C-alpha cells in the first residue's frame, strides 16, 4: 500500500471539504423550484387558452418564450433560495431538517453563497426581462417578499410569517400568465388567490410535524406560540376559504368543478375530524396526513387546470 504523508493527507481532506455539485443544488432548494415552475407553466397554459383554441400549437410556436420564462423563473427562485440559506445560517444548524445544508456545515462560506444568490437572481431577472417587463417585475416581487419580508423579518418575529410569505409562492402563475399577455386577465388573479390560500394549511401542517425543531430554532410558528388547537382551527379555516376560491374558475367546466369540489370537500372533512383529536401524537399523525394530502391536492389542481385549458 502506498504511503500517504501528512501534506498529501491535508490536501485530500481539503479536497473532500470542497463543495460538490450536489451542494450547489441543495442550496437552490430544487423541490421549491420545481413546484413553482409547475405553476408558472400552468399560468402560461391558461393565458394561452384565451388567445387560441389550439394551445398545444401555441406552446410549440412560442417554445422559446416558454423556455425563457421557465428558465428565468427558475433562476429567480433558486437565487432567492440561495439568499434564504445565507440569511438563515444562524438558525438552520438548530433544526434537524436543515443542519446538513452546506451553508451550515461550512462546505460553502457565506460570501460565496451571497454572491451566487445575487448573481443567479440577477440572471433570472434578465431572462424574464427578455420575455417582458411585467413577468420580470412579478418575479422580483416574489423574490422580495420571500427574502426580505419573510426570511429577514416575519419568519423570526411573527406567527403570520407563513401567511404573508405565501405571497411569494402565489406569484409564479402570474409570471407564467404575464409571459403570454402582460395585460393580466382576472383568471391570473384567481390562480394567485388559490395558490395563496392553499399554502397556509400546507405549511401549518408541516409546522405541526416539526414543532420541536422550530421551537429549538426560536422560530415563532403558530403551533409553537399558540399550540395545536388554534393551529388546527386555522388549518380548517383556510381550507374552508380554499374550497369556494377554487370554484371561482367555474367557467373551466363541469369536470374541473367536480374534481375541485370533491378534493376540497374531502380535505375539509379531514380537517374537521382533526378538531376532535386531543392526544398530541395523534395530532401529529393527523398533521402528517393533512400535509401529504395538501401535496396531492396541489398536484391534482395543477393537472386539472392544465388539461381543461388545452
From Swiss-Prot:
Catalytic activity field: heme b + (2E,6E)-farnesyl diphosphate + H2O = Fe(II)-heme o + diphosphate
Membrane-spanning segments: 37-57, 64-84, 113-133, 134-154, 159-181, 186-208, 215-237, 257-277, 290-310
Pathway annotation from the record: Porphyrin-containing compound metabolism; heme O biosynthesis; heme O from protoheme: step 1/1
Topology within the bilayer: Multi-pass membrane protein
Any single GO BP term: heme O biosynthetic process
EC number, UniProt record: 2.5.1.141
Keywords: Cell membrane, Heme biosynthesis, Membrane, Transferase, Transmembrane, Transmembrane helix
GO CC, any one term: plasma membrane
Subcellular location: Cell membrane
Top-level taxon: Bacteria
A Gene Ontology molecular function term of the record: protoheme IX farnesyltransferase activity
Enzyme class: transferase
Signal sequence, renumbered to the chain: none
Extra facts: Carbon 2 of the heme B porphyrin ring is defined according to the Fischer nomenclature.
Annotated function: Converts heme B (protoheme IX) to heme O by substitution of the vinyl group on carbon 2 of heme B porphyrin ring with a hydroxyethyl farnesyl side group.
Stated family: Belongs to the UbiA prenyltransferase family. Protoheme IX farnesyltransferase subfamily.
Subunit and interaction comment: Interacts with CtaA.
Protein name: Protoheme IX farnesyltransferase
Organism for this UniProt entry: Exiguobacterium sibiricum (strain DSM 17290 / CCUG 55495 / CIP 109462 / JCM 13490 / 255-15)
Amino acid at each position: 500500500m502506498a504511503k500517504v504523508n501528512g501534506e498529501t493527507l491535508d490536501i485530500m481532506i481539503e479536497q473532500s471539504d470542497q463543495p460538490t455539485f450536489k451542494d450547489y443544488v441543495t442550496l437552490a432548494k430544487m423541490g421549491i423550484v420545481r413546484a413553482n415552475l409547475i405553476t408558472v407553466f400552468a399560468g402560461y397554459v391558461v393565458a394561452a387558452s384565451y388567445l387560441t383554441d389550439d394551445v398545444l400549437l401555441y406552446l410549440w410556436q412560442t417554445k422559446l418564450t416558454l423556455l425563457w420564462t421557465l428558465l428565468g423563473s427558475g433562476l429567480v427562485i433558486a437565487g432567492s433560495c440561495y439568499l434564504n440559506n445565507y440569511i438563515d445560517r444562524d438558525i438552520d444548524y438548530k433544526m434537524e431538517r436543515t443542519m446538513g445544508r452546506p451553508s451550515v456545515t461550512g462546505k460553502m462560506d457565506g460570501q460565496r453563497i451571497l454572491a451566487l444568490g445575487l448573481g443567479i437572481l440577477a440572471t433570472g431577472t434578465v431572462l424574464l426581462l427578455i420575455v417582458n417587463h411585467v413577468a420580470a417585475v412579478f418575479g422580483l416581487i416574489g423574490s422580495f417578499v420571500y427574502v426580505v419580508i419573510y426570511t429577514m423579518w416575519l419568519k423570526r418575529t411573527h406567527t403570520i410569517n407563513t401567511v404573508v410569505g405565501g405571497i411569494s409562492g402565489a406569484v409564479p402563475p402570474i409570471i407564467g400568465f404575464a409571459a403570454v399577455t402582460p395585460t393580466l386577465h382576472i383568471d391570473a388573479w384567481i390562480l394567485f388567490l388559490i395558490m395563496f390560500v392553499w399554502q397556509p394549511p400546507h405549511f401549518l401542517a408541516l409546522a405541526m410535524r416539526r414543532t420541536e425543531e422550530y421551537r429549538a430554532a426560536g422560530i415563532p410558528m403558530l403551533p409553537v406560540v399558540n399550540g395545536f388547537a388554534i393551529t388546527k382551527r386555522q388549518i380548517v379555516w383556510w381550507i374552508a376559504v380554499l374550497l369556494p376560491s377554487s370554484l371561482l374558475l367555474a367557467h373551466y367546466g363541469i369536470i374541473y368543478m367536480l374534481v375541485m369540489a370533491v378534493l376540497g370537500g374531502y380535505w375539509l372533512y379531514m380537517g374537521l375530524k382533526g378538531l376532535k383529536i386531543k392526544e398530541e401524537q395523534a395530532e401529529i399523525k393527523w398533521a402528517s396526513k393533512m400535509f401529504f394530502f395538501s401535496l396531492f391536492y396541489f398536484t391534482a389542481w395543477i393537472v386539472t387546470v392544465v388539461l381543461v385549458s388545452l
